């Protein structure tokens, strides 16, 4: 596939990169044909590549950059912290400051354990649930992505689905035999699996909005149903809010939908562009982590002062005005996608929750993983390439979602809508 934009330098770098990095990339979802563009710099809602191209960015590093790239307040705070040290191996006051802010925002959060990624957070939360309940089985929803660890890397979304590996080799059957898979938004399937595994299920883990298979919202009442059935059966409810945390609202999906989980995992936005994750939840559960309890979790860079500093500065700026503006922008683009698809008679379904959105080239409603998989992925990639040629970058996969930031202004939205029109017309 030849793109009608200059990418000579990116092509050179990709050929060199393949000699040293597996597949030429450090995460599979970053790869697209014929080769990805290589970024030289980023500012606000723009990426600038090695060939001098400018792209309006709706990927936002897969979610974290809600305040835009190279935010001056975050950069200044981090630069000041760097003069004080970049890793300590002992506690610092800023860890307390950020933990307090997380607890003030997330409804279920009574205590926090900082880690280094969303993957570490979900792995730790599942271990905690198993330790607390003394049960081994977990329920996971088909197509949900909860990180790249063995407990959950089965029938998963995100890059694994994009590149045809939803069930990764290298994971022993004994590891996943305790992972029970259920279609999202299906109440009867949940009831059936719980009834067949009485007093064996430690937790249900889910993305409240499935953001790693596009954007699939929960059906009305579905999260409340999960809350009730888990309480009735002594099962912990874990919200994986690595994507939705601090994006849907100050308190993430829990505040947005009015449902309080037992545990929640966050990341991405929490680090303001630096690596971080966190496990949060009720004190009675969280205190089972060592050193207070017997459930072990540790990490050299847990509570890293650079990441924590960036997180404090980020959350300071996420107020009601921020959520109102970013939600409005995503709504404008979602409406544009619907109207433009209809204008050109293209079967499409568009889903939007707060500042998250995605289009599926499909004529049926998308409520499960199987529905998402039935979408026309070839058409999506044609749409992706045309957007790219017209200066707009979205994630190169049907099974990721788009995000708006505070830096996507009216002029940027207008350019984006023009690009959407061109892309839809070509389809």
UniProtKB/Swiss-Prot annotation:
Q: Which cofactor does this sequence's record say it needs?
A: pyridoxal 5'-phosphate
Stretch forming the signal peptide = none
Give the record's pathway. Answer: Porphyrin-containing compound metabolism; protoporphyrin-IX biosynthesis; 5-aminolevulinate from L-glutamyl-tRNA(Glu): step 2/2
The record's EC number reads 5.4.3.8
Location (main, coarse)? cytoplasm
What reaction(s) does this enzyme catalyze? (S)-4-amino-5-oxopentanoate = 5-aminolevulinate
Q: Which SUPFAM superfamilies match?
A: PLP-dependent transferases
Q: Which residues in this protein are found as N6-(pyridoxal phosphate)lysine?
A: 268
Q: Which BP terms in the Gene Ontology apply to this protein? A: protoporphyrinogen IX biosynthetic process
- Cite the entry's keywords alphabetically: Cytoplasm, Isomerase, Porphyrin biosynthesis, Pyridoxal phosphate
Instruction: Tell me where it resides.
Output: Cytoplasm
What the record says about family reads:
Belongs to the class-III pyridoxal-phosphate-dependent aminotransferase family. HemL subfamily.
What is the name of the protein in this document? Glutamate-1-semialdehyde 2,1-aminomutase
Q: Which organism is it from?
A: Methanococcus maripaludis (strain DSM 14266 / JCM 13030 / NBRC 101832 / S2 / LL)
Encoding gene (name): hemL
């Amino acid at each position: 596939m030849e793109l009608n934009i200059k990418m000579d330098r990116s092509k050179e770098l990709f050929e060199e990169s393949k000699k040293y990095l597996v597949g030429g990339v450090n995460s599979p979802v970053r790869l697209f044909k014929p080769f990805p563009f290589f970024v030289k710099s980023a500012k606000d809602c723009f990426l600038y590549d090695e060939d001098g191209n400018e792209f309006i960015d709706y990927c936002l590093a897969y979610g974290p950059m809600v305040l835009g790239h190279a935010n001056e307040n975050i950069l200044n705070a981090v630069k000041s912290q760097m003069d004080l040290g970049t890793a300590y191996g002992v506690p610092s006051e800023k860890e307390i400051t950020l933990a307090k802010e997380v607890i003030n925002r997330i409804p279920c959060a009574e205590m926090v354990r900082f880690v280094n990624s969303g993957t570490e957070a979900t792995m730790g939360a599942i271990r905690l649930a198993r330790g607390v309940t003394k049960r081994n089985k977990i329920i996971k929803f088909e197509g949900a992505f909860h990180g790249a660890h063995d407990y959950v890397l089965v029938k998963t979304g995100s890059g694994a689905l994009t590149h045809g590996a939803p069930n990764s080799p290298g994971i022993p059957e004994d590891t996943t035999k305790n992972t029970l898979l259920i279609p999202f938004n299906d109440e009867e399937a949940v009831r059936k699996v719980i009834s067949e595994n009485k007093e064996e299920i430690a937790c249900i883990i889910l993305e409240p909005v499935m953001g790693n298979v596009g954007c699939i919202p929960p059906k009305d009442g579905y999260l409340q149903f999960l809350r009730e059935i888990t309480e009735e059966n002594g099962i912990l409810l874990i919200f994986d809010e690595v994507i939705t945390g601090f994006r849907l609202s100050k308190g993430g999906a829990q505040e947005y939908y009015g449902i309080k989980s037992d545990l929640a995992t966050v990341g991405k936005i929490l680090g303001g562009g630096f690596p971080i994750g966190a496990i949060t939840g009720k004190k009675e559960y969280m205190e089972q982590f060592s050193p207070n309890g017997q459930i072990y979790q540790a990490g050299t860079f847990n509570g890293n002062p650079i990441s924590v500093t960036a997180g404090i500065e980020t959350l300071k700026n996420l107020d009601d005005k921020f959520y109102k503006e970013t939600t409005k922008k995503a709504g404008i683009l979602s409406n544009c996608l619907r109207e433009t698809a209809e204008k050109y008679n293209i079967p499409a379904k568009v889903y939007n929750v707060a500042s998250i959105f995605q289009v599926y080239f499909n004529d049926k409603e998308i409520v499960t993983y199987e529905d998402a998989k039935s979408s026309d992925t070839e058409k999506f990639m044609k749409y992706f390439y045309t957007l790219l040629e017209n200066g707009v970058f979205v994630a190169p996969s049907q099974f990721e979602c788009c995000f708006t930031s505070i830096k996507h202004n009216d002029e940027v939205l207008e350019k984006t809508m023009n690009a959407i029109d061109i892309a839809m017309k070509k389809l």
